[in-house]
Curated annotation (Swiss-Prot):
Region of interest called Disordered, as start-end residue ranges on this chain: 131-160
Top-level taxon in the UniProt lineage: Bacteria
Function field: Required for rescue of stalled ribosomes mediated by trans-translation. Binds to transfer-messenger RNA (tmRNA), required for stable association of tmRNA with ribosomes. tmRNA and SmpB together mimic tRNA shape, replacing the anticodon stem-loop with SmpB. tmRNA is encoded by the ssrA gene; the 2 termini fold to resemble tRNA(Ala) and it encodes a 'tag peptide', a short internal open reading frame. During trans-translation Ala-aminoacylated tmRNA acts like a tRNA, entering the A-site of stalled ribosomes, displacing the stalled mRNA.
Stored Gene3D superfamilies: 2.40.280.10
Name by which UniProt lists this protein: SsrA-binding protein
Any one cellular-component term (Gene Ontology): cytosol
Organism: Azotobacter vinelandii (strain DJ / ATCC BAA-1303)
Localization per Swiss-Prot or TrEMBL: Cytoplasm
NCBIfam families on file: PRK05422.1, smpB
Length: 160
């Protein structure tokens, strides 16, 4: 009997900038329509989601601005475009919810992460509302105070 291959686990890429620039309202899991060389590159971890977003048009969702670097060995016979638009696979009711929400002022749809789910590559997208500059400062202050509290707790535990 053939040995079963282990499925890769975990995150491939994250968009930390989106977490900094937006309030995340709702998250969705979407499949990706990829070509073979893209899957091989993602297996090697060669992807970036910084400045990527989701474009909703004609009843479909498209991932724009993501960068998947082609491997030199995998894409020899194909002209690989690292920043091509990739189709996101969502259910109709999820697409309807996204379309309705994005029509409201201030809402956007952004990609948060790419990850493996068994042998499939999934993209976590979010319905998000843009942060103002003062919101970003408030978030940073709260994060700093949490760090100080954790540091104090750790140092108190070491003294005992």
């Amino acid at each position: 009997m053939a040995k079963q291959k282990k499925h890769p686990q975990g995150n491939i890429a994250q968009n930390k900038k989106a977490l900094h620039d937006y309030f995340i309202e709702q998250k969705f899991e979407a499949g990706l329509a990829l070509s073979g060389w893209e899957v091989k590159s993602l297996r090697a971890g060669k992807a970036q989601l910084v400045d990527s977003y989701v474009l909703l048009k004609d009843g479909e969702a498209w991932l724009m601005g993501s960068h998947i670097t082609p491997l030199k060995t995998a894409s020899t016979h194909v002209i690989a475009d690292p920043t091509r638009t990739r189709k996101l696979l969502l259910h109709k009711r999820e697409l309807g919810r996204l379309f309705g929400s994005v029509q409201q002022k201030g809402y956007a749809c952004v990609a948060l992460s790419l990850y493996w789910k068994k042998h499939l590559i999934k993209c976590e997208i979010a319905l998000a509302k843009g942060k103002k500059e003062y919101d970003k400062r408030d978030t940073e202050k709260a994060r700093d105070s949490d760090r100080e509290i954790q540091r104090a707790i750790r140092s108190k535990g070491k003294e005992d």
